[in-house]
Amino acid sequence: MAAWGPAAAAPLLRGSRGLPLWHCAQRMFASQTEGELKVTQVLKEKFPRATAIQVTDISGGCGAMYEIKIESEEFKEKRTVQQHQMVNQALKEEIKGMHGLRIFTSVPKC
């Protein structure tokens, strides 16, 4: 029985995330996706004192799952769960269209 798709023609080498290596290479050098830009913009508006914001689409480019790293003075003296709640609240509209979200928050070091 013949399989459908390009994988049927030649075996694909897969990277650590299970994606074809050519896809990983394309994504590594590509600029931010539309979804990454949108989430970054919302976070910049909601956390104007953030010293670092990094948004990465970890779903392979389809926009279903993101990893967010944000460093902001606004997280000072808040527990991790409270920091994550702040990020979730800021992105409540965007989250409706996502499958998952990884959040890493921190406070700038003096």
Curated annotation (Swiss-Prot):
Domain of life: Eukaryota
Chief place of localization: mitochondrion
Protein's cellular compartments: Mitochondrion
Disulfide partners: none
UniProt keyword Transcription regulation, yes or no: no
Keywords: Mitochondrion
Biological processes, Gene Ontology terms: adaptive thermogenesis; energy homeostasis; glucose metabolic process; iron-sulfur cluster assembly; response to lipoic acid
Gene3D superfamilies linked: BolA-like
Protein name listed in UniProt: BolA-like protein 3
Family recorded in the similarity comment: Belongs to the BolA/IbaG family.
InterPro entries: BolA, BolA-like_sf, Mt_Fe-S_assembly_factor
Organism lineage string: Eukaryota, Metazoa, Chordata, Craniata, Vertebrata
Quaternary structure, from the entry: Interacts with NFU1.
Pfam family, one: BolA
The protein's role, per its UniProt record: Acts as a mitochondrial iron-sulfur (Fe-S) cluster assembly factor that facilitates (Fe-S) cluster insertion into a subset of mitochondrial proteins. Probably acts together with NFU1.
Species: Mus musculus
One GO cellular component, as annotated: iron-sulfur cluster assembly complex
